Regions:
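A short, proline-enriched helix->beta-strand linker immediately N-terminal to the Walker B motif
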Residues: 108-112
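Hydrophobic anchor residue at the start of the ABC signature
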Residues: 103, 114-115, 131
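Conserved ABC ATPase "signature" region
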Residues: 67-84
Length: 187
């Protein structure tokens, strides 16, 4: 967490290797994946959602086409989008459904770390809760770690075990979620 401009998104980009940084990033996982705030801008409007979810496997994996299709369909079902959605395009989906496609696309390559940059802030509260519940279920099922970037302290409290507070590009506080909320050093 941190105010706008504190370096939260820059930290995420550094972990993903999208920006230069000084220092060292250590993680013992397959390539981290990202889920963005606005799923519509990160989904190709010309592709079906099945094709969108298949793309990372086409790029990163060496799988036969039938396995790519099967895995994409399984992942879409896992995030709550059954076969009736697979041939739809992003413009035919609600915001929550598009965010489910983004989550499926991130998880299809089986990362250990998923970075969620304000991933539920554009959704109404009811849909936010559904997506957060889905993320917690997937976290347990796939043994995932999440890096949540959010201004919404309720999201942080509900979903995180540990919290870092950033200010002017620096980590100024790091502790358990309970310690940060009960005894903040940087309120």
């Amino acid at each position: 967490v941190g105010e706008s401009g504190s370096g939260k998104s820059t930290l995420a980009k550094s972990i993903l290797g999208m920006t230069e940084y000084k220092g060292e990033i250590i993680h013992h996982s397959r390539r981290p994946q990202m889920v963005f705030q606005d799923p519509y801008s990160s989904l190709n409007p010309a592709f079906t959602i099945r094709r969108i979810v298949e793309e990372p496997l086409r790029i990163f994996g060496k799988y036969p086409p039938d396995e790519i299709r099967r895995r994409a369909e399984e992942m879409l079902t896992e995030v709550g989008l059954g076969p009736e959605f697979h041939d739809r395009k992003p413009g035919q989906l609600s915001g929550g459904q598009r965010q489910r496609v983004s989550i499926a696309t991130a998880l299809i390559v089986r990362p250990r770390l998923v970075i969620l940059d304000e991933a539920v802030s554009a959704l109404d509260v009811t849909i936010q809760d559904q997506i957060l519940d889905l993320l917690m279920k997937l976290r347990r099922e796939f043994d995932l770690s999440y890096l949540f970037i959010s201004h919404d302290l309720n999201v942080i409290y509900q979903c995180c075990d540990r919290v870092i507070v950033m200010q002017k590009g620096e980590i100024v506080e790091e502790n358990t979620v309970d310690e940060i909320f009960d005894h903040p050093v940087h309120p």
